């Protein structure tokens, strides 16, 4: 799944280096929390197999390593004092995608990031058809012909929809090379302040450099470096712990990606942990690359407050023990927290947002990378159009027009429905969650495909909801009616208040 934000084990949002939705992995210096009281030997030898147990598994996490792209970047020259058309704050997929497309139109663009050549540490999983539509199939380093969902020990859903893992080095290289070819300049710094004038904005960087731009794009992820909010931000949280590991063996079919494994038989001997999992369930997400290399991630789909990281790690250890997965080595690990739902930023406002900054994460699933990349042409084309239009839009008027194109009313209504879905999921325990997904993946593919990929709009979403309700068990229908009534009322009220 998309992994976007680094946290320690308590859900404390760190003040991040802008431009990176910070995520703990082997690419940073945050040490994983060691849980369990068993003392661990210091000298695990190379090739030693470790049956997942207490903190022994985490002792295999490698030391920090950072990998940079191996090519030179054209740097921004502050001595010229030029006003660029677009300043992009943040060098993640969201920011680079817009920078690439705006610069293709011949506009001047500067990308500001403290580590512009650093390869993203995030693990991104996407539906293959989403990347195919954007001509990005060459940026997938592994694909599976389908996915599987384990509802419980007796019910399995085989989904005929190919899935892939993003090659983050290839994706960033491809985007950066196009930016360079188009004349994008890069500045190695962090933006600490923005000052707006009538027709331009001045970005003050931590190295003392001031960059002037007609349009400012905040692509800093959930740090929300420049974009402003005027409502309480109360999202749900998707929390996960994952490892890319070499194992002796694993029980999964290497031709299928495990989208969700809701089984809890691994908790049979630990009633306290089983009860916690019943109340706030977690599932396994797994990418089997071969018979002995696999990405494993224990995930809480959405909770408020989010689960503690050590709780999730404990559940993962119990699951791996039960599955007989013996870890030989860990190539990288990740702690991720994805805020889901919550209020949108102030719309419109002078700084334009994209990606996590602009609320593009799917409130019901946590998916974002494909949605963000698909939204890049919308943002880029709006900037290109309004900068070059005869209307002579500048400053607040120009930004307002771009925001309107990014969040038209049909997209806002769609997001409201997705938040309604999240509010229901927040209330479901493990049995109810199983019943929900048993019905969800029995829907016609066009419905569940469209829901997961943000392709359904409100009229279609209403039919989606009715279809889901009709396929649900009687127990699940009662749960949806009792637990979904208040979220439904809130959604309808928000829809009525939100007008053009």
Curated annotation (Swiss-Prot):
Transit peptide: 1-81
Enzymatic class: isomerase
Protein location: Plastid, Chloroplast
Catalytic activity entry: a carotenoid psi-end group = a carotenoid beta-end derivative
Gene Ontology CC, one term: chloroplast
Keywords, comma-separated and alphabetical: Carotenoid biosynthesis, Chloroplast, Isomerase, NAD, Plastid, Transit peptide
Pathway per the UniProt entry: Carotenoid biosynthesis; beta-carotene biosynthesis; Carotenoid biosynthesis; beta-zeacarotene biosynthesis
Binding-site positions, NAD(+): 86-114
Function: Catalyzes the double cyclization reaction which converts lycopene to beta-carotene and neurosporene to beta-zeacarotene.
UniProt protein name: Lycopene beta cyclase, chloroplastic
Record organism: Nicotiana tabacum (Common tobacco)
């Amino acid at each position: 799944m998309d992994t976007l934000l680094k946290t320690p084990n308590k859900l404390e949002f760190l003040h991040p280096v802008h431009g990176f939705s910070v995520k703990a992995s082997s690419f940073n210096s945050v040490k994983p929390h060691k849980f369990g009281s068993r003392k661990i030997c210091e000298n695990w030898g190379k090739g030693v197999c470790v049956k997942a147990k207490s903190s022994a598994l985490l002792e295999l996490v490698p030391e920090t390593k950072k990998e940079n792209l191996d090519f030179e970047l054209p740097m921004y020259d502050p001595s010229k004092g030029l006003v660029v058309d677009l300043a992009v704050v943040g060098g993640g997929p969201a920011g680079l995608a817009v920078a690439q497309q705006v610069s293709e139109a011949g506009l001047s663009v500067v990308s500001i990031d403290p580590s512009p050549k650093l390869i993203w540490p995030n693990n991104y999983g996407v539906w293959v058809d989403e990347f195919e539509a954007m001509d990005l199939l060459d940026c997938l380093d592994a694909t599976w012909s389908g996915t599987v969902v384990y509802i419980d020990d007796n019910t399995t859903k085989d989904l005929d929809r190919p899935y892939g893992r993003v090659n983050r080095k290839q994706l960033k290289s491809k985007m950066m090379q196009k930016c360079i070819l188009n004349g994008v300049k890069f500045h190695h710094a962090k933006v600490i302040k923005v000052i707006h004038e009538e027709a331009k904005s001045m970005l003050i960087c931590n190295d003392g450099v001031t960059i002037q731009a007609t349009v400012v794009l905040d692509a800093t992820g959930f740090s929300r470096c420049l974009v402003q909010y005027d409502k309480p931000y109360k999202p749900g949280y998707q929390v996960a712990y994952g490892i890319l590991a070499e194992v002796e063996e694993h029980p999964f079919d290497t031709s299928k990606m495990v989208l969700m494994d809701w089984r809890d038989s691994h908790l049979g001997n630990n009633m306290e942990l089983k009860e916690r999992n019943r109340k706030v369930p977690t599932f396994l997400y797994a990418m089997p690359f071969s018979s002995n290399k696999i990405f494993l991630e224990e995930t809480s789909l959405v909770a408020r407050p989010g689960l503690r990281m050590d709780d999730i790690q404990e559940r993962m250890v119990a699951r791996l023990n039960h599955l007989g997965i013996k870890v030989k080595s860990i190539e990288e690990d990740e702690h991720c927290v994805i805020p889901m739902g919550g209020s949108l930023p102030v719309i419109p406002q002078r700084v334009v947002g994209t990606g996590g900054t602009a609320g593009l994460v799917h409130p019901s699933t946590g998916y974002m990378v494909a949605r963000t990349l698909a939204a890049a042409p919308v943002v880029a084309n709006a900037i290109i159009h309004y900068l070059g239009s005869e209307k002579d839009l500048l400053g607040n008027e120009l930004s307002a027009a771009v925001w309107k194109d990014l969040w038209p009313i049909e997209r806002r209504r769609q997001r409201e429905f997705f938040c309604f879905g999240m509010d229901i999921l927040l209330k479901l325990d493990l049995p109810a969650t199983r019943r929900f997904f048993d019905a969800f993946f029995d829907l016609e593919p066009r419905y569940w495909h469209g829901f997961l990929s943000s392709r359904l709009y409100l009229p279609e979403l209403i039919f989606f909801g009715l279809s889901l309700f009709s396929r649900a068990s009687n127990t699940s229908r009662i749960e949806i009616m009792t637990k979904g009534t208040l979220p439904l009322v809130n959604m309808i009220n928000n829809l009525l208040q939100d007008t053009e």
